[in-house]
Amino acid sequence: MTACCSELSKGSSGNQPSGIGTMCHEVSHALGLPDEYDTNYTALGMSYWSLMDSGNYCDNGKTPCGLTAYERDLLGWRPLTVLERSTTVRLRPLEAGGVGYKVVNEANPDEYYVLENRQHVGWDNGLVKLGHGMLVVHVDYDETAWKNNMLNTNATHQRMSFIPANNRYVCLLYTSDAADDLIGV
């Protein structure tokens, strides 16, 4: 039997339950998703862009972010569309029925990029302080890392992380640079 409850959020209004974010994160583990944060707490990982990292804390856990295109694919809910040649596609928001696109490294099929559109609608409404637009996620799949829940434990070799549009990995929290992360490629 597994039990899960909300965490307390310590803030100016006192100790309040954080909302459903942590429960959503833990249920997602039961469905088969790994942690995408650095379980050693030395690297960035996916930050607030993933429920399996800090996204469960969006809006104090009351509106955790939606699942990424990668996570939806991993669960078998919405497959990624592989882009194999130069083409033009329209990225509709995931929360409005859009799909994610996968661009594979021809030299290493376990390394690829996932492109998705994140907007402030549905579950992604909690991302309002972080900007919106195209999210580019770099994946360097390693079966052992995924099976052992160690995706991002090596700060110099992240197995799954977002690529900031401004090329600065400083956006761990809601900072003034946060909105720059998704605009453009």
What are these regions (language model features)?
Residues Y174-D181:
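Conserved small/polar residues in nucleotide/adenosyl-binding loops
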Residues V27-E36, R159-P164, C171:
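Extended polysaccharide-engagement surfaces of secreted carbohydrate-active enzymes
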Residues M1-K129, D140-D142:
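Extracellular hydrolytic enzyme modules, especially secreted metalloproteases
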Residues L130-H132, T153:
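General N-terminal targeting signals
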Residues C5-L8, M160, Y174:
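Intrinsically disordered, low-complexity segments enriched in Ser/Pro/Gly/Ala and basic residues
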Residues E143-V170:
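Acidic Ser/Thr/Pro-rich low-complexity disordered segments
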Residues H132-H138:
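Beta-strand-rich binding/interaction modules
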